[in-house]
Every structure is written in C-alpha cells, then in structure tokens.
Design a protein with these regions (language model features):
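Histidine-/acidic-rich catalytic cores in large beta-rich domains
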Residues: 1-423
C-alpha cells in the first residue's frame, strides 16, 4: 500500500468484476461500496450525470443495459437490439451524431442468426445509441471494412457447438471528435483502426503489417522510433523488432488523449502483448512476457504512428485477456492487469493455451486468477500496488467436464477506474 497517500489521485478504485460484483476500494484496500449480483458487472461506465451504465452476460446475454445510481436505483433499462458485450463510451455533450447529442458508442454484435448476410461472425460491430431514447442510431458491421480473410492472433478457442467466428473481437470504440472518426480496437486482429463517421471509409490501420490483404495495405500506418525515424519493415530484423517492442498485441481500453490538432489522434491503450509476433518461432512465452501501457500519436497526414511513452508491468502483470488504465487529473496512471493468471509456484500463465499464447507452459497445472492494481506517477514510479486474488487454485484434474473450457477464468476484471464516490 502507498506510504504517502498525498501522492495518490483523489477517489476510490471502482472495479467491475466480470459477472460478479462492482466494488469500490479506498486507498487502504477497504471495500466502501458494492453492487449486488442482480446488477450488471462487466463494462461499467460512469456517465456525465453521475450515474453508471453497464450490461453483462447475466442480464439476457448483454441485451439489457442498466443505468443506475450510487444507491442502486435503476433509472433506465435499455432493451438492446444488438448485444453490447464490451466497452461503452459516452461522447461529449457538445458532439452531435446525426443531430443527436448524448450518444453512447458501444462494442456490439448482431444476435446469432440475425446477420443480414447469414454469416456466423460475432463481436464485430459498433452501435451508436441515443441515451435519451434508447434508440440505436447506427450500426457499423466491420466485416464490410476489414473482411474475414486474415488469420487471428491472438484468438479464442473455436466454437464447435455453434460454429461462430470471433475473428475481430471488438473491445473498445469511440469517436474522435476533432477528426470526426470512429476509432475501433479489435483484439483478435491486434489492430486499432479508424473510419470516417457515418461511412465505411477506412482511414488507417494501426498494427503489425503481416498478412493483411493487399487491398488494405495502403491503410497501414508506418511505425516511427522515438527519434522520428521509421522502421524499415522490408528488413526482417527491423520488422521483428517492431513486433516485439512497438506494436499493439491483443490490446484493450483504447482511449483518447486530448489533442485538438486536425489530422492528429493521440491514444492510450492497454497492450496485453500476446505473442508479439505472427509466427510461433518469434513469439514471447507467457512466463517471459509482460503487459504494457502505450501512448501513441497517429498522424493521418503522414500515415505514421509514434510511441510517445510506455509503462511496463513486469511478469507479475502479464494479462492475456483483458486490462485497463486511466490517466488521472494529477498526472498519475491507474492500471488494472485484470486477467493475470499464475500457477501455485508463481509462474505467469495464459488464459487459452494455443489461442491466447503459444501452448508451451512448464507449470504444475494449478491456476489462480489475480488482479494486480497499481497507481503510478507520470514517470512510472509505482505509488500504490495491491493484488486481489480469487483465493482459489484450480486444476483441470478436479474441474467438472462441463467447466474445463473455462477453468482458468476464475476471476477477471474488464473495467476499473479511480473516481469520486459521487460523480
């Protein structure tokens, strides 16, 4: 725990455990607030009016979204046409989408069997929702943007029962208001990409250049080193270096760093860092890996991207499936490595061996979920470091057959913020 609380940002740590509870901890780790199981806990977001909004799998498979306040009063319930399965983002009050203010941007998907093209792809859409009426103003089907030909990296285990295809796995979307551009993060393509709002016109793709269809290659951003010189990606050594130390892999929580300059988009992201390569031979194993926080600047005029800053976690913070961070008004950074897994000897593990990382683990078969939570200053000095664990080691040998596919998912945190008790 922090030795000098005066260095910490104000507020409580609000943590949303996937399909468990939302809780708030003070700087000593004491629980100061929580919601009961009947309230959704997954993609918790505090709105400008001080209320929270969230959807979860327990609430009709993400098809019911609740707006509730700090004392548990439900102010609105949204019956959704498309499931809002990952991050939610409220645009500023001055931004109007097709003449509508107070809009929510949500990672979403067509319900099974309802795709207009009859396809089986999932978690590959973005919904724009009017928070005043609950109406879905627009839906972006990203199959029409990126296609389905590129292999996933990382991925989820195949859905053998239903045959669905989680080829993109959108986990965050928001509108960059300066450039009127929809920014979207796709975990299973390790890509962040931008569309002109209201269209399917692609503007850029941020991610490793390997294996993209030729027709999309002109949208790939060129990576720049800290001194402004570009990586030469025709050189295999430099391309491998960029994969290992520069590019985003399995990223989450892609959010804007304010910059009002037209043609410039600054973002921060939680770089899970799965694999760090499109080839197994060059991939980093979970026990040698770490998740990172990256701050990047995208220049749409030069089609380049440069890393402005990076914060690393060490092996104790490697999270193969989720994670989030927040920049505080005092310059501190709060981060949750929300999908960290370890065996009983402390060896970092991955959530889905062979899919989320290379299937090579020398562990003892035990798995415990842990949620390392940190607050750092702007220089990366750790001021607060606490870990919440499931308190339970699972082993595939003592798990019922019906649960073997998910036995590693015993505690995860998709969203965490440091906020005042009342907004």
């Amino acid at each position: 725990l922090a030795t000098d609380e005066s260095l910490l940002a104000d507020g409580l740590y609000f943590i949303s455990y996937f399909d468990r509870n939302n809780i708030a901890l003070d700087n000593k780790g004491n629980v100061r607030w929580y919601t009961v199981k009947s309230m959704p806990s997954n993609n918790l977001l505090r709105l400008a009016n001080g209320h929270f909004v969230s959807s979860a799998v327990a609430q009709s498979g993400y098809l019911k979204m609740y707006e509730f306040d700090m004392v548990g009063r439900v102010h609105a319930m949204y019956d959704l046409d498309n499931a809002c399965h990952h991050s939610l983002y409220q645009q500023s009050s001055t931004y109007a989408y097709k003449g509508v203010n107070n809009c929510l941007v949500a990672a979403s998907e067509y319900m099974p069997g309802s795709r207009p093209d009859g396809g089986l792809s999932i978690e590959d859409g973005v919904s724009i929702i009017n928070l005043e009426t609950g109406e879905e103003i627009d839906y972006y089907d990203m199959v029409q943007v990126l296609g389905l030909s590129r292999a996933t990296r990382p991925s989820n285990p195949p859905d053998t029962a239903n045959g669905t295809l989680d080829w993109l796995h959108i986990n965050q979307a928001y509108i960059n208001e300066t450039n009127n551009m929809l920014i979207t993060s796709g975990r299973n393509q390790s890509a962040v990409f931008g569309l002109k709002v209201g269209t399917y016109d692609l503007s850029f793709i941020m991610g490793t250049h390997g294996d993209w269809p030729e027709e999309l290659s002109r949208y790939l951003l060129t990576p720049l080193r800290a001194d402004g010189t570009p990586y030469d990606l025709t050189d295999p050594i430099q391309a491998q270096e960029a994969d290992a130390v520069f590019w985003n892999w399995g990223q989450h929580n892609v959010l804007e760093i304010p910059n009002a300059t037209p043609g410039i988009i600054d973002i921060s992201l939680f770089n899970n860092s799965n694999y760090r390569s499109r080839s197994d031979a060059n991939s980093v194993l979970p026990q040698d890996n770490e998740s990172r926080i990256g701050h990047y600047r995208i220049n749409l005029n030069t089609m380049t991207v440069q890393m402005l800053a990076e914060y690393t976690s060490g092996a104790e913070g490697y999270s193969s499936l989720c994670g989030c961070k927040q920049e505080m008004p005092n310059g501190n950074i709060v981060v949750s490595f929300g999908g960290a897994l370890f065996d009983s000897n402390g060896l970092p593990l991955t959530c889905d061996p062979g899919y989320s990382d290379v299937a090579l683990e020398p562990g003892n078969g035990d798995v415990e979920g842990r949620l390392p939570l940190r607050e750092m200053n702007a220089e990366g000095v750790i001021l607060q470091d606490m870990t919440i664990s499931s308190g339970l080691y699972r082993n595939i040998g003592n798990i019922p057959p019906s649960q073997t596919g998910f036995y590693r998912y015993n505690i995860t945190c998709f969203r965490m913020y440091k906020l005042p008790l009342f907004g």
